[in-house]
C-alpha cells in the first residue's frame, strides 16, 4: 500500500524574530507554513520570505496574491506572506491538483480503493451519524486526508502483529473491513470547495453527494443517502443574505431613502433627455410600493444636478415674486414634462433662496410641496412648526421672516380665504402651532423622516 509523499513536520524553536508556524521540509530546510489560496498549503523556505506582519499571526498565514501580481501597497505592514515569485512558482508546479471530491470522482487514489482486485476496495468506514448505507461508507467515497491515513496505519500495524480485524476469505484476504471514524469530524470547508489543506487536513473529506448542509452553512453537517431521498443532494454553499441588502437598508433609513413611495412624491427627480427637456416619467421597481426614476438611480440625479443642469424642482422651492421668503407650492396637477426654460427659472428662484437641505417634504396625504414658509394666514410665520400632514412636523428657516398674510398654497396676494389647509380646516382660521426657537434648531435638522413617526415636540431629525 502506497502512501502520498506529504511534508514531514517537526517542532522547531522559533527564531528571535518571533516567527511562528515554522517547520522542516524533507531536505531539512527551515520553512514557513503558508496557505496558498490558488493551490494548497505550501512550505516556503524562510530565506525566501520577506518580513511582514504575517509572521506575528497566531493562525496560519496566507500568501498575498496582490504581492504576486505586483499590486500590494502595504509593504511590511501587510498581514499576508510576501515570498519570492520564482520560489512560489516552483512550489506551485510541484502541486498536482487539489482534491475535488473523493477518489470515486477524480481524486487521486492513493490506496487503490477503486481496484476491485485489491482488498482495499472492500474497506468501509463507519460514520455513526450517516444514513448512507446504514452508516458504512466505502473507502472510495473518501478523499485521502490525515484521519484516513491514521486509521490505515493502525490497521496495518494490527495485521502485521497477527491480530484479526475482520473475517477473511479462502485466500486470506478480508471479506469486509470496517474502519471506525467516530472520533473524527467532517470538513466543512471541503464541502464548500474552500479547503486548501488537501491531504494534510485533519478532518474527513467525504463525497459531496453524501454530505448535505442541513443548517445552511452553520457548520453542522449531516450525512444522508441520495438514493433514499430520491433527489439531488442539497446545496453545498451557505445561504446567507447579501451584504448589499443590509447596506441598502441602512441607506434607506439614514437620510433620504433609496426609493420613494409613489404617494410621497408625485413628481420624481428630473432627468435630462437628449431633446433638452426634463422627463418626469417613472418606472416601477420590483417593490410594488416604490418607483424609481426612469433610466438611472437617484444618485445619478444628484450627480447630474451638480453639472450644467437645472436643480431638482422637488427639492428646490419656487419662491413667489415679491415674497422671497414664501415658497410656492407644487400641486399634484403638475404636468408630466417641463421645459428647460422653466427649469432655469427654478434655478434662478432657488438661487434667491437658500440650500435645499433646509427643506423637508411631507410623507403623504397632501400635495408634494409642504415647504412651509412665512405665512400668517394658514400657518404662522417663519421658524414655526407645521403639523397638518398626518402629524408630520415640518418647517422652514429661510431667514426672511414673515412677509404678510400670504398662504403658501397661492402665489402672491391671490390667497383665498375659502380653501382648505392640508389638515382640513379653513385658511381663515389660524392653526395653533408650537413655536420653535431658531437658535435651537440647526439647518441640518430638517431632514427626511423615514420612520413615519414624529416624536412629540414637533421636529424630526
UniProtKB/Swiss-Prot annotation:
One of its GO terms (biological process) is post-transcriptional regulation of gene expression. A motif (MKT1-binding motif) lies at residues 446-451. Disruption phenotype: RNAi-mediated knockdown in procyclic form does not affect growth rate. Simultaneous knockdown of ZC3H20 and ZC3H21 in the procyclic form results in a severe population growth defect and a shift towards the bloodstream form transcriptome. Simultaneous knockdown of ZC3H20 and ZC3H21 in the bloodstream form is lethal. A zinc finger (C3H1-type) spans 63-85, 181-208. GO terms for cellular component: cytoplasm. Residues 224-243 are annotated as: Disordered. One of its GO terms (molecular function) is zinc ion binding. InterPro entries: RNA-bd_mRNA_stabilization_reg, Znf_CCCH. The keyword Oxidoreductase does not apply. RNA-binding protein involved in regulation of mRNA stability. Promotes mRNA stabilization by recruiting MKT1 and PBP1. Stabilizes transcripts encoding mitochondrial proteins. This is RNA-binding protein ZCH321. It comes from Trypanosoma brucei brucei (strain 927/4 GUTat10.1). The gene is ZCH321.
Amino acid at each position: 500500500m502506497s502512501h502520498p509523499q506529504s511534508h514531514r513536520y517537526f517542532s522547531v524553536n522559533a527564531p528571535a524574530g518571533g516567527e511562528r508556524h515554522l517547520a522542516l521540509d524533507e531536505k531539512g530546510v527551515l520553512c514557513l507554513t503558508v496557505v496558498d489560496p490558488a493551490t494548497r498549503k505550501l512550505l516556503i523556505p524562510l530565506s525566501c520570505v520577506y518580513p511582514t506582519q504575517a509572521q506575528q499571526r497566531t493562525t496560519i498565514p496566507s500568501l498575498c496574491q496582490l504581492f504576486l501580481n505586483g499590486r500590494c501597497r502595504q509593504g511590511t505592514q501587510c498581514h499576508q506572506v510576501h515570498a519570492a515569485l520564482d520560489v512560489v512558482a516552483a512550489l506551485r508546479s510541484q502541486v498536482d491538483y487539489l482534491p475535488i471530491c473523493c477518489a470515486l470522482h477524480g481524486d487521486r487514489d492513493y490506496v487503490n480503493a477503486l481496484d476491485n482486485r485489491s482488498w482495499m476496495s472492500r474497506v468501509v468506514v463507519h460514520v455513526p451519524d450517516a444514513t448512507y448505507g446504514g452508516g458504512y461508507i466505502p473507502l472510495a467515497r473518501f478523499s485521502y486526508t490525515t484521519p484516513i491515513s491514521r486509521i490505515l496505519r493502525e490497521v496495518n500495524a494490527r495485521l502485521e502483529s497477527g491480530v484479526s480485524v475482520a473475517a477473511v476469505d479462502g485466500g486470506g484476504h478480508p471479506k469486509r473491513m470496517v474502519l471506525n471514524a467516530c472520533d473524527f469530524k467532517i470538513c466543512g470547508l471541503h464541502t464548500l470547495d474552500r479547503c486548501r489543506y488537501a491531504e494534510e487536513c485533519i478532518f474527513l473529506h467525504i463525497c459531496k453527494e453524501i454530505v448535505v448542509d442541513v443548517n445552511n452553512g452553520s457548520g453542522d453537517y449531516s450525512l444522508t443517502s441520495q438514493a433514499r431521498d430520491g433527489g439531488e443532494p442539497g446545496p453545498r454553499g451557505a445561504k446567507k443574505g447579501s451584504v448589499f441588502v443590509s447596506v441598502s437598508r441602512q441607506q434607506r433609513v439614514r437620510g433620504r431613502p433609496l426609493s420613494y413611495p409613489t404617494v410621497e412624491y408625485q413628481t420624481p427627480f428630473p432627468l435630462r433627455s437628449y431633446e433638452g427637456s426634463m422627463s418626469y416619467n417613472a418606472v416601477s421597481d420590483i417593490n410594488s410600493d416604490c418607483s424609481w426614476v426612469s433610466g438611472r438611480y437617484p444618485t445619478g440625479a444628484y450627480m447630474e444636478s451638480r453639472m450644467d443642469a437645472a436643480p431638482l424642482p422637488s427639492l428646490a422651492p419656487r419662491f413667489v415674486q415679491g415674497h422671497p421668503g414664501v415658497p410656492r407650492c407644487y400641486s399634484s396637477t403638475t404636468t408630466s414634462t417641463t421645459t428647460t426654460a422653466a427649469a432655469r427659472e427654478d434655478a434662478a428662484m432657488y438661487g434667491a433662496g437658500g440650500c435645499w437641505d433646509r427643506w423637508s417634504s411631507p410623507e403623504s396625504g397632501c400635495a408634494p410641496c409642504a415647504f412651509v414658509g412665512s405665512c400668517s394666514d394658514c400657518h404662522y410665520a417663519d421658524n414655526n412648526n407645521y403639523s397638518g400632514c398626518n402629524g408630520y412636523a415640518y418647517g422652514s428657516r429661510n431667514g426672511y421672516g414673515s412677509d404678510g398674510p400670504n398662504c403658501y398654497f397661492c402665489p402672491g396676494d391671490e390667497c383665498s380665504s375659502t380653501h382648505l389647509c392640508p389638515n382640513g380646516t379653513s385658511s381663515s382660521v389660524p392653526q395653533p402651532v408650537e413655536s420653535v426657537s431658531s437658535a435651537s434648531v440647526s439647518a441640518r435638522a430638517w431632514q427626511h423622516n423615514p420612520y413615519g413617526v414624529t416624536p412629540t415636540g414637533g421636529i424630526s431629525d
